[in-house]
Amino acid sequence: MENQKKKGTLGTTIGYGLGSMVRTGENLWGFYLSYFLVTVAGVGAAAAGTISGVALLLASVWCIFIGYISDNSKSKHGKRRPIMLFAIFPTAILMSLIFIKVDFGGGTLAYYAIVCILFYLFYYTYLVPYDSLGAELTVDYNARTRIRSLCTVILYVSVFVGGTLVMYVQTGFANAGIGGESGSWSWAVMLSCALPMLVFGLIAWAATKGKEPVGEEIAEQPKGENIVKSYLSVLKVKPFLGIAIWSLLYFIGNTILAGTLVYFGVYVLGLSEATASTYFTISMVVTIVMAIPANWLSGKFGKKTALLIAMCVYLVCGLFVCIKGPSGYADGAIIAIGYGITNSIALIVSYSMVYDIGELNEFKFGDSKVAACIGTYTLGMGLAQAIGYSLIGYILAWAGFDAMSMEQSESVLNAITTTETIVPILFMAASAIAVIFLYRITPKNYAALVEALEAKKEGKEYSTEGFEELL
């Protein structure tokens, strides 16, 4: 416990935060996988959506097992970092293999399906222990938010890399005659995305050496609890059930929003691919700027209220563009700004909210089950992405989207606009209901919980006064 009480050093915090660059792969996937498969690789829109959805669905289920394995690891090197090291190399390699145009005839779909599935399996194998490790750097309510703020800033640097930089690099290679249209994608992804993922993933692994529970701390965990019992016990905790439901619903809307943004810019607003990609730059800058206000909102009003405020921001932006009617670059910029503000605050506070549940679990069960919490949270996120990407593909197919034509019908343009504005708002509104009624951890009752937990561990008298509602 002594290790947990310590606040992570600045170097550890920065090194850990840099590991979020691994999410470059996730952002590249979200922004360009469907676009690459449909317009470059020649895969049908519905098939592309299915490949993405199936890969995310299988990987989401896999993250449950990774969470359980990580929580129960008895490695002398730690519970998180050995798994991170094992997964980072294949994650980077598979990311490169996805964005290669192949022509295996009837086997082309199988190639992309297999590579996409393997990528996300290894990606989550890295990500679940990595995210879990963040909870073990400190138990301080506000310090956790600051850690997640840095992670989110780095995440949005990865948004710039996977959403904007890669497109400029690809365009530069194509204009220089390097690889043609398809080959330029391969080189751009390998150099600007896969390589940084590998380097910064290893930096996070190295910077957190000695910061995870090993030895006696592992021996303190309850014995004989199988994976089913472990996750059922976590889901019985109402605050976590609330944040798990939120993650599922919110990230469906978020995935649809991000995945449709390129289509919205290119086809509805009539922009070039490079110009449309600047929306990701806008959202990245907004996210970085919002890191400090997000911390202030969380500290002033609590993480739950900050999360609800964040979703209201996109509600206003999305409704404005939809009601006014999209007509130019500025409308996409409004969407990008709203997306950046909402997603920045949401990512910062939601992970920190999950971390805070660890102490509640420990008080009730004698084990924080951090990786189980992160695994379940990631499952909700992954299921949401699977559903979201599939919905994008099927909506485009249903509306009659023609990938070979730059001029789309009015019904297709209306479908893209609705998918970019109203659909995300509906999912965010539904997710807010779960948070409002189930997640009741506040700065005040969390402080009382931590105080009682410390007394309980030291064998002293303790009281549940101040956090009874959490039990």
Where are these regions (language model features)?
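Membrane-embedded alpha-helical bundles of multi-pass transporters/translocases
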Residues: 2-471
